[in-house]
A protein has these predicted regions:
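Non-catalytic interaction/Regulatory regions outside core domains
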Residues: 1-119
Length: 119
């Protein structure tokens, strides 16, 4: 299963245009699998920094009766980070340059999430 997860994360990193890295992590911010594409990308720091915020996103979605949180996107001047919540405590994240195509990133993340759900 770990090999399949590694392949899924690797495929996500290769498919997303201008991707700097992809990570499958626990809600605690601990990486399960990660693929760094661009030198200098620190996915472990991203996982650690966003872990608390992802907990808040999940809680807020529940509190506002939105249903289960599915995705969370951070758009900055230099980078875009998209997180998708898997079943249990897993989160899939991908970081791309701000010029990455939003629709293409969402589609690639959705495909990767369906693969993770099948494993």
């Amino acid at each position: 299963m770990v090999t399949d997860l590694a392949r899924t994360v690797g495929d996500l990193a290769r498919v997303v245009r201008h991707c700097s890295g992809a990570i499958l992590m626990g809600m605690d911010g601990i990486p399960v699998e990660q693929v760094v594409v661009a030198p200098g990308t620190d996915l472990e720091a991203i996982a650690g920094e966003y872990a608390g915020l992802l907990h808040e996103v999940r809680a807020l979605a529940s509190e506002l009766e939105c249903g289960a949180a599915q995705r969370f996107t951070i758009r900055g001047m230099n980078h875009r980070v998209v997180f998708a919540f898997a079943e249990g405590d897993l989160v899939l994240g991908v970081q791309a340059a701000s010029r990455g195509l939003s629709g293409q990133i969402r589609y690639a993340v959705s495909r990767a999430m369906s693969e993770i759900g099948e494993q």
